[in-house]
Amino acid sequence: SGEVSHQLTDMSLDDLTAGDVVIKVHYSSVNYKDALAATGRGKILKQFPLNAGIDLAGEVISSESADFKQGDKVLVNGCGLGEQFDGGLAQVARVSSEFVIPMPNGLDAKSAMALGTAGFTAALALHRMQQNDQTQEKGPIVVTGASGGVGSVAVNILSSQGYEVIAVSGREQYHSFLKYFDF
């Protein structure tokens, strides 16, 4: 696979990838894709060099977009962040406004990144499930990969909403852990 190297570098805004919103990053998280990128596996990075981090939560410093103003609390998840564009493992990020989401009421930056991309992905899947009228009365829900990031969040959300959950993991060392919760 080639040599992988890492370095810490002082950068200016001019060094960051293009975008119309500059965000002071308060929190980010380390995701599976970040680990793949850092190890040079998975063909995640589309350009080099690049700041890692596929999500971030913070506060708008400046914006050329009418949709955001200085002081707005925001988050960015996916959309090529940390793959094609400089990511959230930095003090400041510049991103396209089309990828920026206002921080939902009742959610703070730390909590948003504690859930991170895995939580966001699980929530989107469950939202789609509910849009397709998958109710608790229709029977149990099987969650594969239940010991991983997305799966574990999905299991917790589903069980908290009254669904019967069958948690499945290919990792035998996690079977007793999943049985302990008796979803």
For each predicted feature, which ranges?
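Conserved hydrophobic/aromatic beta-strand scaffold that supports enzyme active sites
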Residues: 8-13, 57-59, 92-94, 100, ...
